[in-house]
Regions:
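Conserved post-catalytic alpha-helical subdomain immediately downstream of the catalytic base
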Residues: 158-235
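Ribokinase/PfkB-type carbohydrate-kinase core domain
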Residues: 1-152, 157, 208-223, 227-236
Length: 236
C-alpha cells in the first residue's frame, strides 16, 4: 500500500493554453493525471471536458495522444475520464482505474486477477472511444488490446522480495516504457516487455525515479530474474 500527500498547486490552475502543438516536433502528447488537474477536469460544452478539448487539439495537429488517470476511489471517472477517451490513441492505466472507468471489478474477492473481466474492461474502453490501444497494468504484469481486437499478455519480472524497495512510480515507469516502444514503432509485445522491465527497475528504489537506469540495464533484469507465472494458460 502507498500513501500520497499531494498539493495540487499550479496543477490546479494549468489549462494547457500555453501549448502550441503546431510548433512541436514531438510524436506523442501524454497528459496526466486526469482527476488531478482541476482546470482541465472542468466541463467543456463541445468536447465534454477541457482535458478532452486539449487532447483533441493535439490530435488535430497530428500527434498521437496518451492519457493517464490517478487511482482515485470516487465516482468522478464517468464525468471526467470517459469524455477524454474519444481523443486518446493510447490508454495506459492500472486495473483499478480501468475497472472504475469501464464499470468492471477486475479483482476477485480473494484478490486474484479476473482475466475475463480484464478483457471486458479493455474492450469497453475501446468502445468508449480509445482509438488504437488499451494497456492495463497490474503487479502481476500487463495486458494490451488493440482496436483490431488483438490481445497481448506480459507477466511481470519476477523480482525477489528483498530487491523491492518501494512501489511508487512503477506504473508510470511501465507507461513510459510502453510509450517509448510505441514512439519507436516496436511491436506490442516488445512494448509490454519494455514497460514491465522499466517497472521492475523502478521497484528497486523507494523513490519514483531513483531506480531508473538505461534500457539495456532494465531489460537485463528480465534475463536475470525471469518472469512471474503466465497470467493465462495460453501464454505458456
Amino acid at each position: 500500500r502507498r500513501t500520497f500527500f499531494h498539493l495540487r498547486a499550479a496543477n490546479a490552475l494549468w489549462s494547457g493554453n500555453d501549448l502550441d502543438f503546431a510548433r512541436t516536433r514531438a510524436r506523442i502528447f501524454h497528459l496526466g493525471y486526469l482527476l488531478l488537474l482541476d482546470e482541465l477536469d472542468k466541463p467543456d460544452k463541445t468536447h465534454g471536458t477541457r482535458a478532452a478539448a486539449l487532447l483533441a487539439a493535439a490530435q488535430a495537429a497530428g500527434l498521437k495522444t496518451s492519457a493517464d488517470v490517478v487511482s482515485e476511489d470516487s465516482e468522478r471517472f464517468t464525468r471526467v475520464v470517459i469524455p477524454a477517451l474519444k481523443f486518446v490513441d493510447y490508454c495506459i492505466v492500472n486495473e483499478f482505474e480501468a475497472g472504475k472507468t469501464a464499470g468492471f471489478k477486475i479483482r476477485q474477492p480473494d484478490g486474484t486477477l479476473d482475466t475475463v473481466a480484464l478483457r471486458h474492461a479493455a474492450g469497453a474502453l475501446l468502445q468508449l472511444g480509445v482509438k488504437e490501444l488499451v494497456v492495463v497494468h497490474f503487479p502481476e504484469g500487463a495486458f494490451a488490446r488493440t482496436r483490431k481486437g488483438e490481445d497481448f499478455w506480459q507477466p511481470a519480472v519476477n523480482l525477489p522480495t528483498k530487491a523491492i524497495a518501494g512501489t511508487a512510480g512503477a506504473g508510470d515507469a511501465l507507461c513510459a516504457g510502453v510509450l517509448l516502444g510505441l514512439h519507436e514503432g516496436w511491436d506490442i509485445q516488445r512494448c509490454l516487455l519494455t514497460g514491465n522491465c522499466a517497472a521492475a527497475a523502478c521497484l528497486t528504489d523507494p523513490t519514483c525515479t531513483g531506480g531508473m537506469r538505461s534500457l539495456k540495464a532494465a531489460l537485463d533484469l528480465a534475463k536475470k530474474h525471469r518472469f512471474c507465472p503466465p497470467l493465462e494458460p495460453a501464454e505458456a
